[in-house]
From Swiss-Prot:
The modification Phosphoserine is found at residue 25. Belongs to the tropomodulin family. One of its GO terms (biological process) is actin filament organization. It is found in: Cytoplasm, Cytoskeleton. The gene is Tmod2. One of its GO terms (cellular component) is growth cone. Binds to the N-terminus of tropomyosin and to actin. Binds to TMBr3 as well as to other low molecular mass tropomyosins (TM5a or TM5), but not to high molecular mass tropomyosins (TM2 or TMBr1). This is Tropomodulin-2. Keywords: Actin-binding, Cytoplasm, Cytoskeleton, Phosphoprotein. Neuronal-tissue specific. Blocks the elongation and depolymerization of the actin filaments at the pointed end. The Tmod/TM complex contributes to the formation of the short actin protofilament, which in turn defines the geometry of the membrane skeleton. InterPro entries: LRR_dom_sf, TMOD. GO terms for molecular function: actin binding; tropomyosin binding.
Length: 351
């Protein structure tokens, strides 16, 4: 059911505004522009009377000055006396005055301790220094801070000196810094390019000054190398171009078993490239990608989970998922892959 004012507006729904503006003359258009410039219906800072054109037909009975009106109202409010109270305030207090209850003071009663005669005799004949050592062993800190033990006592050599209120602690074991990575980067790169059979593991961890082109050369050398089984470049400041180079390597390499790219500057795009490359790799069983500079995000984690569900060769995956869904899916996929390897091993032993 339409309201009366809505029925009156229905005839304006199909009006073409462009056609109406085209019929106006230049003088009418200028007049319309002046009206629109003076009025601003959407401005909440203007009073209601200034947001639209005055539509009243009556002539003004007098001038209106808003500032003058405000000053007049303020003056009248200050000159008008406050209304007197119907019941004057006498200051009389009625009712009972609140007095807080005093909390009972807890008094500790000293318990009488009875010792064996031998212990009483030993404590009675013990010197202050021996009692101090005994308190240190028992951990009685109140006795250690007693001023009595700061007084001068006679030592075994007949000289007087203060009992030192210091308990010797255990010596701290020195912790030495880890030595730098001894790997020779250039020599390892040349060995990989020469496909040296003695080089089966390359560890570049924590070497910060390896140039990005050199890391790409390592990835290029791994494409044709048939002996390196484990490659690690954690904390080498590797970025997405390095990750893309290693992704291309994984599509070709048929020997590498383990790859570690943890603690680097690889973003979600680089990680996705590595994950997609695993679909074409049949030999890699372990990959570590955790602790990158920025979080990978939910979309990347879901792609990783889907890849691992389709890949039956990855046995170890190093990454701490932030979402419960991908974490559960990956854990189930890794468990399934390890179970398949165990079943194959058991069947081989039976044969």
């Amino acid at each position: 059911m339409a309201l009366p004012f809505q029925k009156g507006l229905e005839k304006y729904k199909n009006i073409d505004e462009d056609e109406l503006l085209g019929k106006l003359s230049e003088e009418e258009l200028k007049q319309l522009e002046n009206v629109l410039d003076d009025l601003d219906p959407e401005s909440a800072t203007l009073p209601a009377g200034f947001r639209q054109k005055d539509q009243t037909q009556k002539a003004a009975t007098g001038p209106f000055d808003r500032e003058h009106l405000l000053m007049y109202l303020e003056k009248e409010a200050l000159e008008q006396k406050d209304r007197e109270d119907f019941v004057p305030f006498t200051g009389e207090k009625k009712g009972r005055v609140f007095i807080p209850k005093e909390k009972p003071v807890e008094t500790r009663k000293e318990e009488k301790v009875t010792l064996d005669p031998e212990l009483e005799e030993a404590l009675a004949s013990a010197s202050d220094t021996e009692l101090y050592d005994l308190a240190a062993v028992l951990g009685v800190h109140n006795l250690l801070n007693n001023p009595k033990f700061d007084e001068e006592t006679t030592n075994g050599q007949g000289r007087k000196g203060p009992v030192r209120n210091v308990v010797k602690g255990e010596k701290a074991k020195p912790v030495f810094e880890e030595p730098p990575n001894p790997t020779n980067v250039e020599a390892s790169l040349q060995q990989m390019k020469a496909n040296d059979p003695s080089l089966q593991e390359v560890n570049l961890n924590n070497i910060k000054n390896i140039p990005i082109p050199t890391l790409k050369e390592f990835a290029k050398a791994l494409e044709t190398n048939t002996h390196v089984r484990k490659f690690s470049l954690a904390a080498t400041r590797s970025n997405d171009p390095v990750a893309l180079a290693f992704a291309e390597m994984l599509k070709v390499n048929k020997t590498l078993k383990s790859l570690n790219v943890e603690s680097n500057f690889i973003t979600g795009a680089g990680i996705l490239a590595l994950v997609e490359a695993l679909r074409e790799n049949d030999t890699l069983t372990e990959i570590k990608i955790d602790n990158q500079r920025q979080q990978l995000g939910t979309a990347v984690e879901m792609e990783i989970a889907q890849m691992l569900e389709e890949n039956s060769r990855i046995l170890k995956f190093g990454y701490q998922f932030t979402k419960q869904g991908p974490r559960t899916r990956v854990a189930a996929a890794i468990t399934k892959n390890n179970d398949l390897v165990r079943k194959k091993r058991v069947e081989g032993d039976r044969r």
